[in-house]
Amino acid sequence: MKISGFVYLILITTIINLSFSEANNYCKIKCRSGIHTLCKFGISTKPNCGKNVVKGSGLTKAEKLEILKQHNEFRQKVARGLETRGKPGPQPPAKSMNTLVWNDELAQIAQVWASQCKYGHDDCRNTAKHSVGQNIAQQSTTAASFGSVSNMVQMWADEVKNYQYGSTKNKLIEVGHYTQMVWAKTKEIGCGSIKYIENGWHRHYLVCNYGPAGNIGNEPIYEKK
């Protein structure tokens, strides 16, 4: 269905290179800065959006499967050297790239953060197992409808058009979602979302957490074949 009205999409990425403890108590898990999301807000995923009108919280099983499928199909495409886009393209094939699996702990942390209706990155989201990276997106429209999660994931993947493998001139703000999506060493993903109305805008906010984190220093996104 075509969405009428004015639509814009905001994307932010981040570089994560954080330490973590083995403790299950999230208040004891250390990050570069800030308090862990589950320590600060608790484990409840109940929306905490103030005066904003919440229209939907959490991902359906079908949406979770679609997000995972999109990521793995795109990772496979890049790894096989079939991605022709780039600056310049094509992207080189990879020696190896993990197949992502869904992680409920990462998803819970993502959902708790999404449920705050505060667009931006949380300060600390590590687990006892992993340093954790994050992609976020928010689609907003004046129409009485909400964009799909698959559209937002596709926007992350489409950043490949700005990426040159191995170049030091890549700008994270332009390619950071793509590089996290195809970070070869990442093994797990978990996401959360919320739909709400704010000052007449229908907003759909998606948060995806990745473990272990990508976008680490000067490491390559993957080793080319």
Swiss-Prot record:
Q: Where in the cell is it found?
A: Secreted
* Record has Nucleotide-binding as a keyword: no
Keywords, alphabetical: Allergen, Disulfide bond, Secreted, Signal
Q: Hey, what tissues is this thing expressed in? A: Expressed by the venom gland.
Highest taxon in the source lineage: Eukaryota
Disulfide pairs? C27-C39, C31-C124, C49-C117, C191-C208
- In this protein, which residues make up the domain named SCP? 69-210
Q: Which InterPro entries match?
A: Allrgn_V5/Tpx1_CS, CAP_dom, CAP_sf, CRISP-related, V5_allergen-like
Residue span of the signal peptide, if any? 1-23
Does Ribosomal protein appear among the keywords? no
Which SUPFAM superfamilies does this UniProt record tie to the protein? PR-1-like
Query: GO CC terms on record?
Result: extracellular region
Q: What does the similarity note say?
A: Belongs to the CRISP family. Venom allergen 5-like subfamily.
How is this protein named in the record? Venom allergen 5
Query: What is the organism field in this record?
Result: Vespa magnifica (Hornet)
